[in-house]
Amino acid sequence: MAHVAEWKKEEVNELKSLIDKYDVIGIVDLLNIPAKQLQEMRKSLHNKAVIRMSKKNLIDLALEDCNASKNNIVDLSEHMEGQVAVIATEMNPFKLYKILEDSKTSAPAKPGAIATDDIVIPEGDTGFEPGPFLGELQQVGIPAKIDKGKIVVSKETVLVEAGEEVSAAVASTLSRMDINPMEVGIDLRAVYEEEAIYTSEVLAIDEEQTLADVQNAFRNAFNLSVNAAIPTEETISTIITLAYTRAINVGVDAAIMTSETSEPIIGLAQAKMLALASEVSGTEGALDDELAEKLSNVAVAAAPVVEETVEEEEEEEEEEDAEEEAAAGLGALFG
């Protein structure tokens, strides 16, 4: 039987203790992160999360041993890529992912690095005087020329597509142009919480879109609850108001007299009476003196509105005439 180094046993035990202590356990990739930057990131996570670097096979062993108490946690082994480390926290996976993503910074492209996104060179002035750098740009595939005493990029260009390797020449050119296209930070590969594994694809959500979706779902649920008359804490007030309004309308339409409906019923009846009286007012003897007076009062009350409208129209016409005269005067002035 092969002898197992004591330090490996201790390392597995410490990993197991860490995994057992926290509810949320993740696998992160620390590849290509400079030591100083990693130290700053770990400091920023102080009291929020613990990062422990270790060998993949030792992490595998720790996950297997912890699978009895944390069902399915062994599945994290499927997501170990790059320079692996374990991250342990009490934050929910989505918050952890956001914090790690927000901590990422831009960095220069190194020869041999794989572009995670398209590296785009924008159109415009490079800030360089005419010289050998023009040939260097053209050599790596950047359309450049001299314009007004400066080297300019004549057209926006995708220099390196996502997934392609950055050559030494391209890395040198990008460095001289002060373009830092790479993103350096802790990559969260997968997280375990309550027997579920969340990959980075699941955790990468659009916060604004998610909020809009939740608000839309709430509106739809609210409307459904109101229309189906399903009372809840949020909808009961609206349901009662809607029911009251509908009851009043039914009472008015059916001429059922109550303390709430009597006034609108009488008002509606009077309006119908006056409308009918107006229709027959041209027939001699059709209206008694009282009804004729009421109809006359309605007509007089409406007259000022009509006169005011006519006056406003006349004023508008006068303003338009004045504007046309002014325009004609300006036309004559400027030939």
Swiss-Prot record:
Molecular function per GO: large ribosomal subunit rRNA binding; structural constituent of ribosome
Key words of the record: Ribonucleoprotein, Ribosomal protein, RNA-binding, rRNA-binding
Q: What is its biological role?
A: Forms part of the ribosomal stalk, playing a central role in the interaction of the ribosome with GTP-bound translation factors.
Compositional bias annotation for Acidic residues = 308-326
| Stated family | Belongs to the universal ribosomal protein uL10 family.
Listed SUPFAM superfamilies: Ribosomal protein L10-like
Which InterPro entries does the entry mention? Answer: Ribosomal_protein_uL10, Ribosomal_uL10, Ribosomal_uL10-like_insert, Ribosomal_uL10-like_insert_sf, Ribosomal_uL10-like_sf, Ribosomal_uL10_arc
What GO biological process terms does the UniProt entry carry, in alphabetical order? cytoplasmic translation; ribosomal large subunit assembly
What name does the UniProt record give this protein?
Answer: Large ribosomal subunit protein uL10
Matching Pfam families, A to Z? Ribosomal_L10 (PF00466), RL10P_insert (PF17777)
Q: Where is this region: Disordered?
A: 306-335
Q: What's the name of its gene? A: rpl10
GO cellular component terms, semicolon-separated: cytosolic large ribosomal subunit
The record's listing under CDD domains reads: Ribosomal_P0_L10e
- Assembly description: Part of the 50S ribosomal subunit. Forms part of the ribosomal stalk which helps the ribosome interact with GTP-bound translation factors. Forms a heptameric L10(L12)2(L12)2(L12)2 complex, where L10 forms an elongated spine to which the L12 dimers bind in a sequential fashion.
Which organism is the protein's source?
A: Methanobrevibacter smithii (strain ATCC 35061 / DSM 861 / OCM 144 / PS)
